[in-house]
Swiss-Prot record:
This is Glutamyl-tRNA(Gln) amidotransferase subunit A. Heterotrimer of A, B and C subunits. It comes from Geobacillus sp. (strain WCH70). It comes from the Bacteria. Its EC number is 6.3.5.7.
């Protein structure tokens, strides 16, 4: 049995009783990485020397100062490689940032460091978080621990795979259109996209600034709540972070959902959703009914426009955000330039991968003078309609529930030839980002040995309710206890 089969609160108790040390936890992480990393390939950079030194420092602190410390104290964590870490290489899985060492920490890293968490390393992802399979990484292919011939999802594929494989007890990811929830579903773990503004984006390398959110990927709902508790809250360094009180999320995990009203959008169980996935969700709803909740079918009529809206808006924002990677200040610079303009052009042509180039071109086109109103402005108007759909449903219901993804994990290489089939994989998660509301994916079944995710969506800043529902479901089932046979 691995130490990481325990919940974080249980590991915390073992530390308090001196039955294990912080060094034991870090050793366990690197031991497991040594066993499975060659197969899974979740990490881009390991932080072994610093992690072991910090573990020793925290063990000394424990010996001198006793047990008065938070639940994350001494816990190993993996960090998605688009969150800047002072002195630890941050690449966004892109050749253009292959040698970038940040000189400051993201706000979430400062908060984790203050809580005593220990960074084990930086995790693989789709380049600049653009993708749904982690196949767009500029460096390596991460594999799904449940089936090494399949993708782990994306763009936070490294984060989900590392947690599922037991390399770390938890990890941070980022979610722009499903990039935490979709890989969490594919890898059979718990992934939360918080409300937009709940967690500071300062130090998150921007893809689409109006959509990006950092969030936790964990083995259990309780662990997820502990991690969000530490990273959530107002940050003066991020003008979009919200001045909304952060409740005690763990206290919300009462197991009581009697009288809870669930909305199930017919659009989320219709065309394109695999029958076995649909059945897993209907079975999950029966479990929630037994626990005292009720559900009704509703409509989110503008969801069918979400995919097109998202790709116009996200690509437009990416076009602007990625203009800073020009070879002048940091990162990759071409050796073949004849002049300054040529240097910009060659650096970006050689440094960016195909998917990033595709989205930059799409966004630049959508923002161009003759097409701005027809594409970008119209997409913003449709985004408002999508948001209003959610607001209308939430007037009557507490949460919205459906599948996280239309299918379980697909085979490596299966969708790389056709960007549109790849994009369609996020069709159920994208509306949540456009509306800015929180959503969580929890394991709810298996299809041919592959995990299926249940998506629970809540009102703005009401992560507590979706945690309560997710936890009640988790405690009534044992899907979260299943582990891949690595």
């Amino acid at each position: 049995m691995s130490l990481f089969d325990h919940k974080i609160s249980e590991l915390h108790t073992l530390l308090q009783k001196k039955e294990i040390s912080v060094s034991d936890l870090v050793d366990e992480s690197f031991r497991r990485i040594g066993e499975v990393e060659e197969q899974v390939q979740a990490f881009l950079t390991l932080n072994e020397e610093n992690a072991r030194a910090k573990a020793k420092e925290l063990d000394d602190k424990l010996a001198k100062e006793g047990n008065d410390f938070g639940v994350l104290f001494g816990m190993p964590i993996g960090i998605k490689d688009n969150i800047v870490t002072k002195g630890l290489r941050t690449t966004c899985a892109s050749k253009i940032l292959y040698n970038f060492d940040p000189i400051y920490d993201a706000t979430v890293m400062e908060r984790l460091n203050e809580a005593g968490a220990i960074t084990i390393g930086k995790l693989n992802m789709d380049e600049f978080a653009m993708g749904s399979s982690t196949e767009n990484s500029g460096f390596q292919l991460t594999r799904n621990p449940w089936d090494l011939e399949r993708v782990p999802g994306g763009s936070s594929g490294g984060s989900a795979a590392a947690v599922a494989a037991g390399e770390v007890p938890f990890a941070l990811g980022s979610d722009t259109g499903g990039s935490i929830r979709q890989p969490a579903a594919f890898c059979g773990v718990v992934g939360l996209k918080p409300t937009y503004g709940r967690v500071s984006r300062f130090g998150l390398v921007a893809f689409a600034s109006s959509l990006d959110q950092i969030g936790p990927i964990t083995r259990t709902v309780e662990d997820n709540a502990y991690l969000l508790q530490v990273i959530a809250g107002l940050d003066p360094m991020d003008s979009t972070s919200a001045n909304v009180e952060v409740p005690n999320y763990v206290e919300a995990l009462t197991g009581d959902i009697k009288g809870l009203k669930i909305a199930v959008p017919k659009e989320y169980l219709g065309e394109g959703v695999a029958e076995e996935v649909r059945q897993s969700v209907l079975d999950a709803l029966k479990v929630l009914e037994k626990l005292g909740a009720t559900w009704e079918e509703v409509s989110l009529p503008h969801s069918k426009y979400a995919l097109a809206t998202y790709y116009l808006l996200a690509s437009s924002e990416a076009s602007a955000n990625l203009a800073r990677f020009d070879g002048v200040r940091y990162g990759y610079r071409t050796d073949n330039a004849k002049n300054l303009i040529d240097m910009y052009k060659q650096t970006r042509s050689e440094g960016f991968g195909n998917e990033v180039k595709r989205r930059i071109m799409l966004g630049t086109f959508a923002l161009s003078a003759g097409y701005y109103d027809a594409y970008y402005k119209k997409a913003q108007q449709v985004r408002t309609l999508i948001k209003q759909d959610f607001e209308k449903v939430f007037e009557k219901y507490d949460v919205i529930i459906g599948p996280t993804t239309p299918t379980p994990a697909f085979k490596i290489g299966e969708k790389t030839h056709d960007p549109l089939t790849m994009y369609a994989n996020d069709i159920l998660t994208i509306p949540v980002n456009l509306a800015g509301v929180p959503g969580i994916s929890v394991p709810c079944g298996f299809v041919n040995g592959l995990p299926v995710g249940l998506q629970i969506i809540g009102k703005h800043f009401d992560e507590s309710t979706i945690y309560r529902v997710a936890h009640a479901f988790e405690q009534a089932t044992d899907y979260h206890k299943q582990k891949p046979a690595l």
